[in-house]
């Protein structure tokens, strides 16, 4: 069984907001390839994996997105905006981004026989 976590190419700040500072921060040498659900599925299938399950996960809350949009730098989850990150809002935001396929992270579980 393989469990892999990768940055999501459809991250809300990349695909919808198109925040150049965030894009430059995200596309660095450790992240040579960002995947979508489709590209990660094809990659794993080509490598011989089966029973592939890919789920979007949102690791950073709304405060982080606001901080990026306003201040153009990371750390929003620890910024002056962090007070808005109630459990209910965080869950709703995560679910909304998952429904839009715009989470920041993809988690894949696959098996090889």
List the model feature ranges, each with a label.
Residues 1-19, 29-49, 105-113:
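Conserved SAM-binding loop
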Residues 12-15, 52-54, 63-64:
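Extended hydrophobic-aromatic, low-complexity segments
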Residues 18-21, 69-70:
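Short secondary-structure boundary/capping segments
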Residues 21-23, 97-98:
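Short, flexible, glycine/charge-rich loop motifs used to bind or transfer phosphoryl groups or to couple energy/partner
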Residues 24-28:
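Glycine-rich FAD cofactor-binding loop and adjacent beta-loop-alpha segment at the N-terminus
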Residues 37-57, 82-87:
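A SAM-dependent methyltransferase catalytic signature shared across enzymes that methylate proteins
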Residues 56-113:
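A C-terminal cap/extension of S-adenosyl-L-methionine-dependent methyltransferases
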